[in-house]
Amino acid sequence: MMSLLTPAVLLTQRSHTLTLSVSTPLGLVMTTYESSTLKDARLKLVSQKEVNGKLHLTLGAGRLLYIIRIFLATGTTQFLTMVLPSTASVDSLPGTYLRRC
């Protein structure tokens, strides 16, 4: 169940692109991320939380974590990629896999 306090989020993955749409107080914010590491990746939404006016999304595939921060007051986004240690994998974390379009 999603909290009514959390902004609505739509993630769409196609090949090596990820499209993010977020409903904020300023309106709809849409951003597209392209990365060769997203190609053929089976993305999993690991966490989604809102903290101090920022929406934090954590996605993962294999040993890669993709962290997306959306500043709700301005609509600005940040996209970070992290590599997990060789003994760790996103597959062992709880979460929901995204369906491909």
From Swiss-Prot:
Transmembrane segments: none annotated. InterPro entries: Bunya_NSs (IPR000797). The keyword Disulfide bond does not apply. One of its GO terms (biological process) is negative regulation by virus of viral protein levels in host cell. It holds the Pfam family Bunya_NS-S. Keywords: Eukaryotic host gene expression shutoff by virus, Eukaryotic host transcription shutoff by virus, Host gene expression shutoff by virus, Host-virus interaction, Inhibition of host RNA polymerase II by virus. It comes from the Viruses. Belongs to the orthobunyavirus NS-S protein family. Inhibits host transcriptional machinery, by producing modifications to the phosphorylation state of the C-terminal domain (CTD) of RNA polymerase II. Inhibits phosphorylation at serine 2 in the heptapeptide repeat (YSPTSPS) of the CTD of RNA polymerase II, suggesting that the elongation step of transcription and/or 3'-end processing is prevented. Inhibition of host transcription machinery leads to shut off of host cell protein synthesis and inhibition of the host innate immune response. NSs also seems to be involved in the nuclear relocalization of host PABP1. This is Non-structural protein NS-S. It comes from Bunyamwera virus.
